[in-house]
């Protein structure tokens, strides 16, 4: 660097108000300085502004003097830090390091949660570059059911042991009642285009086959098989065949009644509204039944539904199904197929589910999210949501409440 120039970092703090940044940079503009870096944050109307600039040495004294007077007039604090060429070059060299986004989400965020998470990042050699809040300002009344808090940490570096870090974060999420997502910060994170959902216990808060079984008087038998399958203890296809056989003779009208009263999962309406508004393609890939999937398709404008079709003859279930069973392997095939049809890279896909048969598609998708999932699924997933509704997915995609609310209330 030219020895006639020098680098100076200024840090300004104080009560924020319109025009403050303009006033500071106007002073700098009198000396035609080069801005090398600038960052600003506002927390509870308190400003923190940092500017790194290069100026002629002969001007530095006058610049600092004028800035001191300006800061006094504005009622803010200002400090000056000289930056050596070596320090600056070292800072520039770090820009080639890997970047990640760690999203923390919950009904509320506590100092204990943030301490635990940031300690793990430090142990892994990761540095936090920035932190921002994605959710709106929190009310003091914590009793409100729709309250949630989310922050996004931009971190830099390469984890020393990615698998160990993932395990530790997942353990914390269970112990401290919070959700997290750790994603590479690249172009695909901002360009997700296809999202595939499991249906039962994900989009809806029930297992449809259990509802049918109750009406058929075989609830206990079917429920036991369902739970065993979702835990991954028995093959899904085998369990499905056993359960469907127990429904033989049930009247078709029962399915209509159940469909009209499906308990929709918290946050689904908001999530679907936003996804459709921003042009995402949406699919249901379910080990449940097409009858209920198509009902949700009409309700929310879902683009694709792949599930299992029950055979019905003379208005009665026969105890058999038509076509291939949609199991974990089939969900992967369908995700690939839809991505190909939509001309979407697999890295641009999202998969959300709760059961063992969802794990293959969660692993394949660019972003796989376990939602209120079984322990085996949570243990093998890279992202999970357990504390809030399904619209928590939006925060993992980087959406901010303030940004969404500008485009319509939910």
Spans of model-derived segments:
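Active-site neighborhood of HAD-like aspartate-dependent phosphohydrolases
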Residues: 187-237
């Amino acid at each position: 660097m030219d020895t006639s120039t020098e680098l100076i970092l200024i840090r300004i703090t104080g009560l924020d108000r319109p025009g403050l940044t303009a006033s500071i940079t106007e002073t700098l503009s009198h000396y035609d300085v080069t801005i090398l870096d600038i960052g600003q944050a506002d927390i509870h109307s308190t400003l923190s502004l940092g500017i790194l600039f290069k100026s002629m040495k002969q001007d530095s004294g006058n610049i600092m003097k004028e800035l001191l007077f300006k800061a006094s007039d504005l009622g803010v604090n200002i400090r000056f830090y000289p930056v050596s060429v070596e320090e600056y070059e070292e800072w520039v060299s770090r820009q080639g390091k890997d970047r990640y986004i760690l999203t923390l989400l919950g009904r509320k965020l506590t100092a204990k949660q943030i301490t635990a998470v940031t300690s793990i990042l430090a142990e892994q050699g990761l540095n936090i570059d920035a932190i921002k809040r994605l959710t709106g300002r929190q009310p003091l009344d914590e009793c409100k059911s729709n309250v949630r808090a989310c922050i996004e940490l931009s971190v830099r570096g390469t984890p020393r042991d990615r698998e160990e870090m993932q395990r530790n974060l997942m353990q914390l999420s269970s112990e401290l009642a919070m959700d997290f997502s750790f994603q590479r910060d690249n172009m695909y994170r901002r360009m997700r285009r296809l999202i595939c959902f499991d249906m039962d216990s994900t989009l809806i808060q029930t297992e449809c086959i259990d509802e049918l079984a109750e009406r058929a008087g075989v609830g206990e038998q079917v429920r036991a098989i369902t739970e065993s399958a979702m835990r991954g203890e028995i093959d899904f296809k085998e369990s499905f065949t056993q359960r469907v056989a127990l429904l033989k003779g049930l009247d078709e009208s029962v399915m209509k009644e159940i469909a009209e009263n499906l308990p929709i999962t918290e946050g689904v309406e908001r999530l679907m509204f936003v996804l459709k508004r921003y042009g995402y393609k949406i699919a249901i890939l379910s080990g449940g039944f097409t009858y209920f999937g198509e009902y949700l398709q009409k309700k929310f404008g879902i683009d694709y539904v792949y599930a299992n079709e029950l055979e019905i003859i003379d208005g009665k279930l026969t105890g058999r199904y038509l076509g291939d069973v949609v199991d974990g392997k089939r969900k992967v095939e369908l995700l690939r197929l839809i991505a190909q049809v939509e001309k979407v890279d697999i890295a641009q896909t999202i998969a959300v589910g709760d059961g063992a048969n969802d794990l293959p598609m969660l692993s394949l998708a660019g972003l796989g999210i376990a939602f209120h999932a079984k322990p085996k699924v949570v243990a093998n997933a890279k992202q999970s949501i357990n504390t809030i509704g399904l619209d928590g997915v939006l925060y993992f995609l980087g959406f901010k409440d303030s940004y969404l609310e500008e485009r319509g209330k939910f």
